[in-house]
A protein has these predicted regions:
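Disordered, acidic Ser/Thr/Pro-rich linker "stalks" and the adjacent N-terminal cap
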Residues: 490, 494-550, 558-571, 579-580, ...
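Catalytic beta-strand/loop cores that center a nucleophilic Ser/Cys/Thr
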Residues: 39-47, 353-358, 370-468, 484-490, ...
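Beta-strand-rich binding/interaction modules
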Residues: 197-256, 266-272, 280-289
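Short beta-strand elements
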Residues: 293-310
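Substrate-binding/catalytic cleft of secreted carbohydrate-active enzymes
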Residues: 1-159
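Short beta-strand-plus-loop segments that form exposed binding edges in beta-rich domains
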Residues: 612-619
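Aromatic-rich peripheral "rim/lid" segments of glycoside hydrolase catalytic domains that contact
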Residues: 142-209, 657-658, 663, 674
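Short alpha-beta junction capping motif
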Residues: 323-371, 452, 476-479, 710
């Protein structure tokens, strides 16, 4: 018999790959000290036709990747009925009731399918990158089915009972996970025809079957993405109809033999962009016959043409003034949007990232990795639901579950919490799916009536320099200028205002903190944080350049610690008034990652606030354990005599915060916001002029400054 030895399992090697010795093979997921030097051998760094060879430079042993593919999909709550034995699905019941509370339970089947398709995209990229990488000769996929422990990791394409979830077939799975796999090195799935006359795609073969392949020809064809229709019923998503299109381009690669090996070049596919119609979705299909069976793989493409997208005549301002029926006004300023809507105009409102409420977290294209209880983040993603049959997407190709053409569009967008509007009167055109531990009901693009005005609102940056952003904006504007733009739901401007918040208010106020090491909490960014250690209470002073009417404080806990380290519980806030400190609020908070808005007993006119953290949800300097109380999880002091295992677990007294912002009185906040808009206008005026010159039937935003002045 043969015995194989390895020196460790799973965790990163604390050395460069060429320094690893004394083993028969290497099993890990990261080399070197952290990411550099060396690096990861799983995840996005090897995607888009790449690989992980730099992470394995000069290694002497074959490598197996540890726990690849921990991408999650949303839970199907029908699985609850399968638990008929001793194990009770309490976790799924909690997730279901959270979904019910956030008004998304009725979308469960859509969430399952669309998040599942997003999960499959990630798994395909991970596995193909693994197969493209020299020296990697295997992987441990975590897992084929859902894992119920450690926070509930819904990482499987099968449910906890090893049953199919219904969003990927065995044949599709074998395309990228089989003994023989066809691979392509595709740098981007979104192609700008104006900048690429020809696309070259190297094809490789990874083959570990029973015998080598002899005299094999590989065939390829580029076809328009088939149009698929589904219905949702009692048993989930059911295919109604799929309409396939004839190939646009096709060809055959040179006949070759393939050994039992990977990284075997099969040749190159060349796509002439002149032969391909833009603003369409395509599928590249590559296939061959291997030992009596057909081996096939497919990849999506979205073709755009930036030269045609930019060929838009300047706006006819006189027509815009006299014929408002077809005029569309574009703005990123809330007061300008309000004025236009009050006048009955059609408005595309692009809400900037930094002007969005802290109740609206960023959206992430990649799904949660393992789960957010073990690895919490402010930004989360589980795929999306798109009303792809809506006329707003008439010239922007998309399926209902999205695709790679959305990646750059949503990565820097905030999910607008439409549940905060207090009504269900919007048409949600692009809905990101939130992770099941939070279940926020959100939107990236929606339409509604506001008074007599018609609003299309988005948190997507449509001004970014990508062909897909230009194509989406053009498609939206074409719809908004048409007679079809008749939003049905009515929403008040006051309701919409719940989505706005000045994230950089402390910068506008010139706020400083008396300890520079704590300044991270004043940057307005919940993805950074400050951390104090020592002993309670912790006090610090925030001072502004001049006095303001202050009505409260916004506090956001640290967003990325699984144990809510340093999360504030009890506090005292004082203001410097008449040369003395005056208490303006004192109290306790509940435990959650949500922003906490602490209203003062009354508004104060001051330039100094003293913030004191009296204690947090952590036991002060004691051996501890975690316990659930009605208002959150607490670290409680442990009896180390009765429980010796707790001995030595001595946490420090820690206070942390990701954001501490002053809340201004309403009138003062409006003044600061308008001043900020003027400054932004002056900085971007020249860029705005150029943008306006390229928009058809759009009234220039240059007038917004004058309107705000008034």
């Amino acid at each position: 018999r043969r015995v194989l030895f390895r020196s460790q399992s799973g965790w990163p090697y604390p050395m460069e790959p060429d320094k690893i010795t004394g083993t028969d093979y290497v099993y890990f997921h990261r080399s070197g000290f952290g990411i550099q030097p060396g690096g990861t051998i799983r995840g996005p760094r090897g995607w888009n036709g790449g690989d992980y060879r730099e992470s394995l430079k000069d290694i002497s042993y074959p490598v197996i990747c540890h726990e690849l593919g921990q991408w999650c999909a949303y839970p199907d709550f029908d699985v609850i009925d399968k638990f008929t034995g001793y194990l009770q699905p309490g976790n799924f019941e909690i997730f279901r009731e959270s979904a019910r509370a956030h008004d998304v339970l009725g979308q469960n089947k859509e969430f399952v399918y669309n998040s599942g398709r997003q999960q499959v995209r990630m798994l395909k990229e991970d596995l193909e990158a693994n197969l493209r990488t020299p020296y990697i000769y295997g992987f441990e996929l975590l897992d084929l089915h859902d894992y119920l422990g450690q926070g509930t990791a819904l990482v499987g394409i099968l449910d906890p009972f090893w049953d199919s979830k219904g969003y990927v077939t065995p044949n599709e799975w074998r395309q990228f996970c089989d003994e023989t796999v066809l691979l392509a090195r595709i740098k981007s799935y979104c192609i700008d025809r104006a900048k690429n006359a020809t696309i070259s795609i190297p094809i490789e073969v990874s083959h570990f079957g029973r015998a080598p392949l002899q005299s094999v020809r590989i065939h390829w064809q580029l076809e328009q993405q088939p149009v698929t229709e589904y219905t949702y019923g009692e048993h989930g998503k059911t295919l109604t109809q799929t309409v396939f299109q004839p190939p646009v381009l096709c060809g055959t690669l040179k006949q070759r033999d393939y050994a039992l090996e990977k990284n075997q070049s099969a040749g190159c596919i060349y796509l002439n962009m002149e032969d391909i119609q833009p603003d369409c979705a395509y599928v590249l299909r590559v296939s061959m016959k291997a030992n009596g069976r057909i081996v096939e793989n497919t990849w999506p493409f979205w073709i755009f043409d930036s030269s045609k997208l930019n060929q838009v005549s300047a706006p006819d301002e006189s027509k815009a003034e006299s014929d408002t029926h077809e005029a569309v006004f574009i703005t990123s300023e809330r007061f300008h949007a309000e004025t236009l809507l009050n006048e009955g105009k059609r408005v595309l409102f692009e809400l900037p990232y930094e002007d969005t409420s802290y109740d609206c977290p960023p959206v992430r294209f990649n799904p949660s990795f393992w789960n957010s209880q073990m690895g919490p983040t402010w930004a989360r993603g589980m795929g999306m639901i798109i009303k792809n049959a809506h006329p707003a997407f008439a010239s922007f190709p998309t399926t209902a579950d999205g695709g790679w053409q959305w990646q750059s569009l949503i990565e820097n967008a905030r999910g607008l919490r439409v549940e905060k509007l207090g009504c269900d009167c919007i048409t949600n055109l692009v809905q990101p799916i939130d992770e099941w531990n939070r279940n926020d009901k959100m939107s990236l693009l929606f339409e509604c009536q506001v008074g007599t005005g018609r609003l299309m609102m988005t948190s997507i940056n449509l001004e970014q320099d990508t062909p897909q952003a230009s194509a989406l904006k053009k498609s939206i504007l074409s719809y908004m200028k048409s007679d079809a733009f008749e939003p049905q739901g009515q929403v008040s401007w006051k309701q919409l205002s719940s989505l706005f918040e000045m994230n950089d208010v402390m910068k506008e106020l010139g706020a400083k903190i008396d300890d520079d090491s704590l300044s991270a909490c004043l940057d307005g960014n919940p993805q950074t944080f400050m951390r104090l250690t020592g002993g309670y209470p912790y006090s610090f002073i925030i001072q502004t350049t001049q006095k303001h009417n202050i009505s409260g404080i916004l506090y956001m806990p640290r967003q990325n610690h699984r144990e809510h380290e340093g999360e504030l519980r009890s506090y005292c806030i004082e203001a410097w008034v008449n040369d003395t400190w005056k208490q303006v609020q004192k109290g306790k908070l509940s435990s959650s990652y949500e922003p906490k808005r602490i209203a003062f007993l009354q508004e104060v006119y001051t330039d100094r606030i003293r913030f004191t953290a009296l204690d947090t949800f952590s036991a002060p300097g004691k051996s501890c354990f975690w316990a659930m109380e009605p208002d959150g999880w607490y670290q409680k002091e442990a009896d180390t005599t009765a429980n010796p295992e707790f001995k030595g677990q001595l946490p420090q007294d820690i206070f942390s915060a990701s954001v501490i912002n002053l809340l201004l009185a309403e009138e003062e906040e409006t003044d600061v916001w308008k001043k900020r808009i003027k400054q932004r206008k002056l900085v971007h005026l020249e860029d705005s002029k150029q943008v306006v010159n390229n928009l058809q039937n759009v009234t220039s935003e240059k007038s917004a400054t004058a309107e705000i002045d008034n």
